[in-house]
């Protein structure tokens, strides 16, 4: 089965597509667009130009995933939208333009997902994972 994830970060938006069969996960697509959403935040408010950039990129990636008939498309946002005061306005704008709005995840959930992904692909038994993002840093 195919799965797609659109990760909306403070600096980039990434589309990842995976094939999952019999417990094996094979990455198929890894596409990134550097949009610099953090640069569109003024006094804690994302300005309309930033909303437009986010919506265009999410919409393009969502269309790519739908064109592959991927049944499960997850769209997540991290600190890029977690920390803005006009979060609801931004989500509404993205939903209207792109047809889908990201789920905003907490820093704790972001760290949990980092851990799951990293331990699967890196086969780590012990260690520390540091995810240095544009708007937050998680330690696992």
Q: Residue spans of the language-model regions?
A:
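Active-site-adjacent helix-turn-beta-strand microarchitecture at beta-sheet edges
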Residues: 136
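Nucleotide/phosphate-binding catalytic cleft detector across ATP-hydrolyzing
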Residues: 1-8, 16-132, 140
